[in-house]
């Protein structure tokens, strides 16, 4: 007959293991398929194919954006943490607190194809493991591909294809200070390195300074042509009812401009010396003139592309796009402004046929033409906080991903679309580059030795006076401003 064993004397507070740690490690390795895997939780009810819910210990060392994995039918499926909440369970009227985490499926990862979505979900109580506990193979890229960011808590880089990025249009969104422009500048550099002609419309003056090492050209009307156009637009707005005579004069002036514009665009697109053009109109204070000239140059690019079908791959970058292609319909803009914006919008609708793509960069998503944004097939979204912008992005990402956007940190962004080797939205992170911060400060520093002011600025756009004039073009109130020398109304 069995007898009761003598109790083992233990100090108070000592926790003893009731199992063999070595066998436990072997068991976890069998479940995860990875040696030294870190168990973080177990799936719970209400999980779906796209979104996983799992319970973790309150002491688990995980965070928003981290990646976890589980095995389904012998395959390793990755998920990214989007959100978490506290929950309470009762066992015989004894409440217990816990954390329930939501994670979105990234899919199966391979170094060649990136993230491929998986068509099923794990069973209840399936174990989940931290991706940081294992090493992944680095992505295999072709000469037309490059890395755009790292997946948090992993050594995996997300890869984009430059051809899809250009042909199917892209949008870079985010409020000021989130790394949006830095990212756009990097994409411009990647495109130029792959022999893409890049035409940047930039009224901030930053691209000229930051991309100087790429030896850009600067197509633009002469100061005399710019003043003449402003005068003609002013005459149309202030002339007699209908302004028939003034409109005829304006049309002749624009036709004359079209000829010189065509020469500049042809020279740039056919040149082998430079793949970058920066279009600035800092001297122009009339916003209608700014829009007219922008439309003229972009339409000329489209005309060249039609005549030389796919002879060159062309990417048009619209920095601060809300000032160039605003959402005009139903917003109090006049018919002339609506016409100009719709003409620019045709590039988004027809550009792919001729090898012309758009890259829209803006901090005010809600104010950009939805005709253009809806044609973008790849989105890189940094922090946004206004509800109108988030409502639009509900149609791009899932609502769960959209809720993540206001919480993104600097240099963090959501990426999704045709150009990426990822079939589901993915949160990415980029490292802070101190050298770029120094370049940004130099670009913003006023030039005390300019010697000119306003229209006579001679420093290339870095002086205070130049920036003051530039800022006048960045308003969404399309009121007619008298050109210099015309005085007030």
Regions found by a protein language model. Name each.
Residues 1-169, 187, 324, 368, ...:
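Basic- and hydrophobic-enriched, low-structure N-terminal and domain-boundary segments
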Residues 86, 109-110, 204-208, 283-286, ...:
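Conserved nucleotide-binding/hydrolysis micro-motifs of P-loop NTPases
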Residues 143-219, 415, 449:
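Glycine-rich phosphate-binding loop of nucleotide-binding enzymes
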Residues 176, 285, 289-400:
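Conserved P-loop NTPase motor cores
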Residues 189, 194-281:
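Switch/coupling segment of Walker-type NTPase motor domains
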Residues 195-196, 274, 355-356, 374-378, ...:
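Short glycine-/polar-rich loops that comprise or flank the Walker A/P-loop
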Residues 270-271, 412-489:
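Conserved P-loop NTPase motor module
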Residues 400-412:
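Conserved C-terminal "switch" segment of AAA+ ATPases
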